[in-house]
From Swiss-Prot:
Compartments where located: Nucleus
Biased composition (Polar residues): 308-324
Residue segments, region Disordered: 21-40, 229-262, 295-346
Gene3D superfamilies the UniProt entry points to: Transcription factor, T-box (2.60.40.820)
Gene name of the record: vegt-a
One Pfam family matching this protein: T-box
Protein name, as recorded: T-box protein VegT-A
Domain of life: Eukaryota
Amino acid sequence: MRNCCRECGLSAGHLEPEASSNCASDVKSSPDMDSVSSQDSLYLPNTVGASLEDQDLWSQFHQEGTEMIITKSGRRMFPQCKIRLFGLHPYAKYMLLVDFVPLDNFRYKWNKNQWEAAGKAEPHPPCRTYVHPDSPAPGAHWMKDPICFQKLKLTNNTLDQQGHIILHSMHRYKPRFHVVQSDDMYNSPWGLVQVFSFPETEFTSVTAYQNEKITKLKINHNPFAKGFREQERSHKRDDVLKILQQSPSKRQKRKKWEDSPEADISDFPKAICVKEESIMDPAGVYQNWVSDHEANQGLTPHSPESEGANQEQQVPTSSSNFYNKSHYRRSSQHLSSPFELGEPSSRRLTPDIATVPDSDPDSLAVFHVIPTQNSAPERTCSMNFSMEAPMKQPLRGAMYSPYGADQWLVPAQGQYRPVGYTAYPTDLSTQGAVAHPHSAMSDWSQYSLFPYSCW
């Protein structure tokens, strides 16, 4: 047939009526074509055809009014454009193209569960044609399997540079499928064979679905919308309802538990920590151990200054310190040393207060004074306690300093040579800076080796 067409000087896609009739008569009268089967007639240009795949699905959407989403970045169609071709020459190369044309010159709107015209259509955007990525390909390739345009995308961006089909929202369109015979997309001339369109593929372009029935059809049939299936939604609703039904009872149980004594017991360790950190008021039971200067300041057990002063552990310099082993084991974890506090003991303006064990005040009414010992090796720091096994110890008497009471007497003027420095950074008018003499002394044991604690 192609040889016959070449002899006539015309291409197969542009046969004139007379030439085509002559060629047909030549084909019939040629003895070489007697063995041509009826299948060869499918290769003739006027016998090329196409059919729509998934026609039942398209028909369901068409009955409700198909809607296609368009976005700025481009959105694929569902149902997809899928056709099947037949009647092509198996060895000739063809190209497949798709374009979209408006159905009318109106703009539409969704009103009362139906589409209705809402004015004149907007100017049509530049017409774009989508070329199937397999083009060009032999006819046998196109006829082998259904042809799917799954990578086709619709957009409403008039400045799109990705090759997507540009459409206007709320307008009606239909796709057209072009079959073009060509060996090369750019160089060889195109020979138009056929154009196909199907009424089931007509749709309205939207940016959001207007018809709920279309939404349900998309959810039920689109494989990429499995998370939106109505069945899964019903299960989720049931789960939510169960949770909501159980929530009031759970709240009541929670409220009952909070009101019960168990909730108070759960916070008991926290209260214990607060009690352990509290320090006994030195001006309460043991008022005789507080100096006048500290009493004038009016420190209370809840005062930060009183708490900070009582938590320090000092070397015995200007007062006696009283400790008990059982009390030390209980409170040593909460008291920090002067090195940890980062404050030297010489900066304390108030005398040291001895901490006594938590016991009945009546049992401490009588104290036995330990005889004064002046030997230097026996002078110890108030922190030097023997750590014994943690067991209940009997109540012991208070530990007094090995220094005698005569050490607190202020020497007369001129008896000793004054030292040029003092233990306090500033001159205190109320107490005065007492300088410790270090010369002309017969007994060094009753005085400290240093004017301030350095341990």
